[in-house]
């Protein structure tokens, strides 16, 4: 019985909702008809006359107070709406309307939405996995001591956020530590040092780890697992301690390079020893994996030091050798460092060869790959490109390929052109980036802006064509053209990665909600009414009385604008304009 009553109520509610959704015009006319039929019992005309008399007795001070109060209230609503929109990206009034009024006016029921979500579970999960905002290590990240700290000393601003530095600490613990670190005293100290938040504490721990190795103590190391054969060896140098000092204590790139060379000597020895013992058990295999990460990191940073110090050809050779020696370690994205160095040498044929290997459909893309490919195609036509000539004769095949490459790059990361065209100011790139986000755009433009300027006409071609990308993807959050839809979570992640003094670029740009514009107009209009009422109380009082008479009297159809102004002239006793003699005759 109860179930039948509940079902009847649900059916009745659905019928009412349906009627409000599709038959609202019929309901509106029914209400008007009822008001017309009941106008005599309800004494509508008498009530309107009473209201009109009451309004006629009001003084101008009342209207000043009324308009001033309404202006103040609408201004407070505007301030609250603007704050809510800047913080949460949506209008509070619209959100409340959608959450509470939409179900009453025929919105989607929660059960039906859950059913639809469950039926499309596979597609939704695939889309979530694709659009998940994964943070990547910046392959071109700067040195903390020699570059980031110097910026802080000069400007007093912190270029790195706590979230970014915390991610770096997690990377260091992942790449530079293993479960057997407690067996070596220096590595045990460094394992704690990577967890330290205070930079001075980390540096002190690194010095302590190096001092332990200065003691010529001896340790017994098994030559073969589960064997009775032992060899006496000196404790090896701690490579990770040199890495920390080179990254955070060195104040110049030259000092960092010296420390990295010492780290290379220590890390190479550890790598060779662990390479011989890697098949003797899981513990040795973990040590070898850690020593491999340490060695690759040191060699990559040495190549970056050479690039910073102007030895670009030496840096290119070191990167090529590193990629040949460890071809499977793609997590460091060394090819992006190589592309930047080759562009500095203007070795465009070598750049094209690297792109042919890494710009593959099965490999993850980056702004470096997409925009470098666009730069190479733009280089072939940019020196002779003219928008006026192109509009007259049309685009040639080479120009069309260049424009398509630019559109492809802009679709992948739409934030880069503003930095390349210097429409937004650059800051130091963070240690981690979000692909397709503002952080990746900053990291790319910081190093590659000079390469675009070096190619004659490339920035002009980019300026003329990059905005055409948005016509092909009118709804980038729902459907892309060459890539997956643009992820929604980039703005939130970029705000965590980038410092607070930087204005984060948002795509697609959010438009102001209707209610913010409405409250702004309402506030301005009521403030203007309050000012006019205060300055001209008699005139505004006459207008208010005339308007109340128009809308409240039963004979409002006979009124027009002429009668309003005639009444204003009578109330204020404005004399008629003098007429000329010719007009009187």
Curated annotation (Swiss-Prot):
Its main location: membrane. It is found in: Membrane. Keywords: Glycoprotein, Membrane, Phosphoprotein, Transmembrane, Transmembrane helix. It is a multi-pass membrane protein. The keyword Transmembrane helix applies. The chain crosses the membrane at residues 15-35, 62-82, 512-532. Glycans are attached at residue 47. One of its GO terms (cellular component) is membrane. The modification Phosphoserine is found at residue 386. InterPro entries: ST7. It holds the Pfam family ST7. The keyword Transferase does not apply. Belongs to the ST7 family. This is Suppressor of tumorigenicity 7 protein. It comes from Colobus guereza. The lineage of its organism: Eukaryota, Metazoa, Chordata, Craniata, Vertebrata.
């Amino acid at each position: 019985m109860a179930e039948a009553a509940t079902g009847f109520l649900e059916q009745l509610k659905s019928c009412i909702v349906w009627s409000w959704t599709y038959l609202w015009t019929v309901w509106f006319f029914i209400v008007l008809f009822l008001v017309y039929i009941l106008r005599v019992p309800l004494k509508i005309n008498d009530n309107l006359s009473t209201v009109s008399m009451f309004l006629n007795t009001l003084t101008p001070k009342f209207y000043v107070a009324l308009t001033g109060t309404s202006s103040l209230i609408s201004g407070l609503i505007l301030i609250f709406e603007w704050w809510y929109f800047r913080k949460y990206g949506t209008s509070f009034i619209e959100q409340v309307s959608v959450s509470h009024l939409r179900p009453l006016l025929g919105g989607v029921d929660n059960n039906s939405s859950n059913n639809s979500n469950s039926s499309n579970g596979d597609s939704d999960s695939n889309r979530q996995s694709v659009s998940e905002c994964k943070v990547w290590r910046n392959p071109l990240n700067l040195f903390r001591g020699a570059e980031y700290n110097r910026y802080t000393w000069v400007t007093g601003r912190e270029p790195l956020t706590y979230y970014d530095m915390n991610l770096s600490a997690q990377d260091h613990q992942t790449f530079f530590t293993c479960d057997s670190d407690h067996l070596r005293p220096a590595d045990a100290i460094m394992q704690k040092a990577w967890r330290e938040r205070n930079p001075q504490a980390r540096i002190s721990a690194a010095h302590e780890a190096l001092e332990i190795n200065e003691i010529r103590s001896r340790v017994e190391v098994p030559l073969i697992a589960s064997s009775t054969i032992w060899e006496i060896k000196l404790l090896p140098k701690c490579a990770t301690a040199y890495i920390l000092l080179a990254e955070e204590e060195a104040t110049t790139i030259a000092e960092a390079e010296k420390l990295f060379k010492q780290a290379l000597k220590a890390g190479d020895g550890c790598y060779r020893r662990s390479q011989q013992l890697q098949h003797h058990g899981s513990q040795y295999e973990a040590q070898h994996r850690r020593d491999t990460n340490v060695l690759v990191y040191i060699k990559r940073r040495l190549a970056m030091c050479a690039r910073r110090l102007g030895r670009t050809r030496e840096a290119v050779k070191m990167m090529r050798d590193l990629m040949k020696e460890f071809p499977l370690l793609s997590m460091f994205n060394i090819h992006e460092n190589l592309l930047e160095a080759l562009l500095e040498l203007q070795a465009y044929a070598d750049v094209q060869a690297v792109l042919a290997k890494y710009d593959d459909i099965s490999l993850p893309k980056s702004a470096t790959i997409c925009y470098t490919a666009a730069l190479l195609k733009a280089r072939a036509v940019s020196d002779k490109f003219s928008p006026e000539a192109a509009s007259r004769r049309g685009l040639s095949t080479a120009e069309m390929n260049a424009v398509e490459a630019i559109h492809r790059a802009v679709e992948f990361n739409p934030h880069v052109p503003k930095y390349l065209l210097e429409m937004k100011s650059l800051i130091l790139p963070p240690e981690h980036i979000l692909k397709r986000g503002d952080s990746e755009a900053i990291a790319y433009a910081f190093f590659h802006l000079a390469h675009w300027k070096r190619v004659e006409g490339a920035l002009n071609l980019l300026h003329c064509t990059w905005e055409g990308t948005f016509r092909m993807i009118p709804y980038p959050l729902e459907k892309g053209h060459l890539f997956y839809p643009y992820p929604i979570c980039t703005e939130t992640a970029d705000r965590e990665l980038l410092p607070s003094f930087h204005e984060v670029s948002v795509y697609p740009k959010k438009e102001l909600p209707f209610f913010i514009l409405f409250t702004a107009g309402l506030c301005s209009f009521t403030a203007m009414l309050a000012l006019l009422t205060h300055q001209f109380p008699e005139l505004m009082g006459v207008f208010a009385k005339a308007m109340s008479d128009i809308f409240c009297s039963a004979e409002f159809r006979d009124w027009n604008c002429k009668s309003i102004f005639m009444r204003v002239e009578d109330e204020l006793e404005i004399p008629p304009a003098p007429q000329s003699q010719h007009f009187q005759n």
